[in-house]
Amino acid sequence: MDVKSVLSNAFAMPITSPAFPMGPYRFINREFLIITYRTDPDKLRAVVPEPLEIGEPLVHYEFIRMPDSTGFGDYTESGQVIPVSYKGVAGGYTLAMYLDDHPPIAGGRELWGFPKKLANPVLAVHTDTLVGTLDYGPVRIATGTMGYKHRQLDLAQQKKRLETPNFLLKVIPHVDGTPRICELVRYYLQDIDLKGAWTGPAALELAHHALAPVAELPVLEIVEARHLLADLTLGLGEVVFDYLDQPEANAR
């Protein structure tokens, strides 16, 4: 393979059989259980990178079922998203996500900078309850429950919430272990067709784990719960802040 061929095929690894395809990345019947809770503000500030800003000390704990996604297949994801603002615009910062499918782990980390790890999340209806669980190895570290479709939510309002910007801290090391990429990335969910939105009574339990520290942001109070069903496209990202271009990087 000559240099021109390497460059023309340089999208993802392995170069002869990439772990994930080029987009667009469309999701059909993507189902969310989002439980918003109040947490310790000091612990929240310790994990949210500048220049993002936090307001109320809230966390969205999410269980997401994705049965039909372009190139990524059928999988489930779970993790924590923190409400933040950037230059006065409200959005969400993804702290960590845990999922059961390699292509979106590889693609998520390499393309956008999603902080993804391999685990075993489940989202399913059990009789009258929507139940989300997350196991890391043999250890249950998250359990979320919500009464199934107790009350409808306003679709236009919930769609507007899904359309707000999302932020990621993309970190990729150089071959010598020093940072090669250290960027704040912004992306949007696009072409959203919100098919349903509901709420109900909810509960969330988090357990401590050395390698999946979801409980480091403790649940102090449940604020709201949402069950959403949508078709949407995961848009590609843009770099809004490069940490390696800052004066602090030159002082390392």
UniProtKB/Swiss-Prot annotation:
The residues annotated as the active site are K116 (schiff-base intermediate with acetoacetate)
The taxonomic lineage of its organism, from the top, reads: Bacteria, Pseudomonadati, Pseudomonadota, Betaproteobacteria, Burkholderiales
The protein's name in its UniProt record: Acetoacetate decarboxylase
User: Which family, according to UniProt?
Assistant: Belongs to the ADC family.
What's its catalytic activity? acetoacetate + H(+) = acetone + CO2
Purpose of the protein:
Catalyzes the conversion of acetoacetate to acetone and carbon dioxide.
Enumerate the SUPFAM superfamilies for this protein.
Acetoacetate decarboxylase-like
Stored Pfam families: ADC (PF06314)
Q: Which InterPro entries match?
A: Acetoacetate_decarboxylase, Acetoacetate_decarboxylase_bac, ADC_dom_sf
Q: Transmembrane residues, as ranges?
A: none
**Keyword Amino-acid biosynthesis attached:** no
| Keywords on record | Decarboxylase, Lyase, Schiff base
Enzyme Commission identifier(s): 4.1.1.4
A Gene Ontology molecular function term for this protein is: acetoacetate decarboxylase activity
